[in-house]
Amino acid sequence: MNILYLINYAGKAGTEKYVLNLMHILSAQGETCHLAYNVPGQLSETVSSEGFACFRFEMSTKKAFSAAKKLAGYCRENKIDVIHAQYPMENVIAILSRLFYRKVKVVYTSHLTIYQNTKWKILNRLFTPFDHRIIAVCRQGADIMISNGVKKDRIQVVYNGVEPKRERVYD
């Protein structure tokens, strides 16, 4: 499977560590991982130095259709199966990219625990029904997503963003 991680700022905070961990875990399992970003930083440098494919392009809400078209072109060219968006803006662009390349599925992980303004609540109501999966990294994050316009039944909480292997229980 070809997975593209989509993040605006490829810096060095918790979300970036989450993306890097997933890229390491899934590439070790034989998946092909790509990183698409707007603003370079430690994550993009690390990922590039480790040999992962990287794609830098301009992303903004004002130029969402242009960004979506560029993203779709990259996905088509690289036969991307899944776009994993990390924040609301990236999610909107990923969903819009499906207008130009329908084969891709979109997974959205919310790392935010902030209440959004009316504009984003409306955008969440319009766009999140098209996500194939929506992940919150904590219960509070899920509750805030609901208040931000995401339907409760669409959200799955995966603590720390990576589902751990279940330990065998001995009686």
Predicted regions and their residues:
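Membrane-interface segments of envelope glycosyltransferases acting on lipid-linked substrates or membrane lipids
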Residues: M1-D171
